[in-house]
Structure formats: C-alpha cells, structure tokens
C-alpha cells in the first residue's frame, strides 16, 4: 500500500524523511519527536506536520527526585509508574510553542499548550 504518513523517532530523522520525500515529489504528513527549534521552523514552513514535546528535562528531574528520595530515607513513589503528558505541536499551537522556546521554558516548564 502507498505510504500516507511518516512518524519518525526524532525530529532529526523527520528532517531526513522530509528531504527525501521532497526530492521525490512526495507529499505526506511527517511527524517527529523532540520539539527541536528547527522542527518548529519546519512546521511553520510546511515541511513537517508536527513534533511531539516529551520534556526530557522534566523526565530526568522526576526520575532523579524519585531516586534521591529513595536513597535518602527509603521513600518509594506513590505510584509505580509516573507519567508526563507529551504535547503535540502543530501549526494550530505553533505560536505558543515558539514563544515558550524563545522564553527558554519549553523543556523546563512544559508551557507550549494549545
């Protein structure tokens, strides 16, 4: 069957897919992960449909907080799994994401919202 969309494991991979698709005259939604500033530009320019912000800084901070509490006094997390809500960034909420990146808070606070 024909390929109708591509979800890449990272924005860097999505950039490569976009170049190959464009060189071959193919148009389809391409989605990456990481919310790199270059991905926001690619979304604005119509070369990438979306990126997903996963907040790696918040992931590592949360993991370290859990580890340090356990090492300090044996405190275990209330829940076995800790979930952070990723944000899908598209043209619809791109302005919010760009403002957050400009302010330097995209990864620290998770502010790009629809």
Each PLM stretch: what is its role?
Residues 1-2, 18-26, 44-48, 65-72, ...:
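Sec-exported extracytoplasmic/periplasmic mature domains
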Residues 45-57:
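Short beta-strand elements at the ligand-binding edges of bilobed clamshell
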Residues 7, 29-31, 49-52, 89:
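Structural detector of well-ordered beta-strand residues that form the stable sheet scaffold
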Residues 39-43, 60-63:
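Short, charged, surface-exposed secondary-structure boundary motifs
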Residues 58-114:
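Hinge/cleft segment of the Venus flytrap/periplasmic-binding protein
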Residues 34, 55, 92:
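Residues at the C-termini of beta-strands that transition into short coil/loop
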Residues 11, 54-57, 61:
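Electropositive phosphate-/nucleotide-binding environments in soluble metabolic enzymes
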Residues 1-42:
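Hydrophobic alpha-helical
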């Amino acid at each position: 069957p024909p390929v109708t969309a591509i979800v890449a494991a990272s924005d860097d991979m999505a950039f490569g897919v976009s170049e190959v698709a464009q060189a071959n005259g193919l148009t389809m939604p391409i989605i990456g992960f990481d919310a790199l500033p270059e991905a926001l530009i690619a979304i604005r320019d119509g070369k990438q449909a979306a990126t997903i912000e996963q907040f790696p800084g918040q992931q590592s901070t949360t993991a370290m907080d859990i580890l340090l509490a356990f090492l300090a006094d044996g405190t275990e997390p209330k829940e076995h799994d800790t979930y952070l809500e990723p944000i899908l960034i598209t043209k619809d909420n791109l302005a919010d994401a760009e403002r957050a990146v400009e302010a330097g808070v995209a990864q620290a606070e998770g502010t790009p919202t629809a």
